[in-house]
UniProtKB/Swiss-Prot annotation:
Compartments it resides in: Cytoplasm
Disulfide bonds: none
Top-tier EC class: transferase
Name of the gene: rsmA
Protein name: Ribosomal RNA small subunit methyltransferase A
CDD domains in the record: AdoMet_MTases
PANTHER family hit by this protein: DIMETHYLADENOSINE TRANSFERASE, DIMETHYLADENOSINE TRANSFERASE-RELATED
General function of this protein: Specifically dimethylates two adjacent adenosines (A1518 and A1519) in the loop of a conserved hairpin near the 3'-end of 16S rRNA in the 30S particle. May play a critical role in biogenesis of 30S subunits.
Length: 255
């Protein structure tokens, strides 16, 4: 019996009904490149491999890796031993379908890491802490809207698929969970701006949520820049839409 490791944020999915709902939402097909992050004890791995001839999986826990290697031969399950936060998903090709019950202690940095591979991804289906999903899909001028919302909404269409109670896991987490689908936007839907500068602008704007843009963006923007862009410097970061941050980035790049 594998004992869940707190340092890995392990909560294993044990509800078959939830498992099948997730796999049906993914609808995996032979010939697709499907990658599972954190397969754990194989709750998703098993039904995925019932529908697929081959699956990639990224796993850090050596005990789990050994268990999975005993369960499936490498021609069915290719295991990539290591930290998903450092893994080069681009090494697996294009048109990737990425899935997983993500460890809650690394879910936000992992979503930021996956952003850089958006052009190579077809879609992603993740089980996450409900609070994180609320932030991902949040609208401007709400408490949940922030850096994560903007960075993901710029690159992905997102759909909240279902809620998952703590009882679906062993051990039960202290929080509610949810399943979300992310589909990369087409090139035409994503205005071309300097990605590093965009990330810098958004991070600066939200570094101190209670302060106005006049203060948070003072290192990047002058008073006349706000006038030129038609943006009120007395607003807070959460008042601006993704398109506003794209406009700021494009303006700063040409100033």
């Amino acid at each position: 019996m594998h004992t869940p490791r707190k340092r890995f944020g392990q909560n294993f999915l044990i509800d078959d009904g939830i498992v099948h709902a997730i796999v049906n939402a993914i609808h995996p097909q032979a010939g697709e490149t499907v990658v599972e992050i954190g397969p754990g004890l194989g709750a998703l791995t098993r039904p995925l491999l019932e529908r697929l001839p081959h699956l990639h999986a990224v796993e850090l826990d050596r005990d789990i890796i050994a268990r999975l290697r005993r369960a499936w031969p490498p021609e069915r399950l290719t295991l990539h031993a290591g930290d998903a936060l450092k893994f080069d998903f681009g090494s697996l090709g294009d048109d990737l379908r990425i899935v997983g019950n993500l460890p809650y202690n690394i879910s936000t940095p992992l979503l930021f890491h996956l952003l850089e591979f958006a052009p190579r991804i077809r879609d992603m289906h993740f089980m996450l802490q409900k609070e994180v999903v609320e932030r991902m899909v949040a609208s401007p001028a709400t408490a949940d809207y922030g850096r994560l919302s903007i960075m993901l909404q710029r690159r992905f269409h997102m759909e909240w698929l279902l809620d998952v109670p703590p009882t679906a896991f062993d051990p039960p987490p202290k929080v509610e969970s949810a399943v979300v689908r992310l589909i990369p936007k087409s090139t035409a839907e994503v205005p071309s701006v300097d990605e590093a500068l965009f990330a810098r602008v958004v991070a600066a704007a939200f570094a101190q949520r209670r302060k106005t843009l006049r203060n948070t963006l003072s290192a990047l923007m002058r008073p006349e820049d706000f006038v030129a862009l038609g943006i009120d410097p007395g607003l807070r970061a959460e008042a601006l839409h993704v398109a506003d941050y794209e406009a700021i980035t494009a303006y700063l790049a040409t100033r």
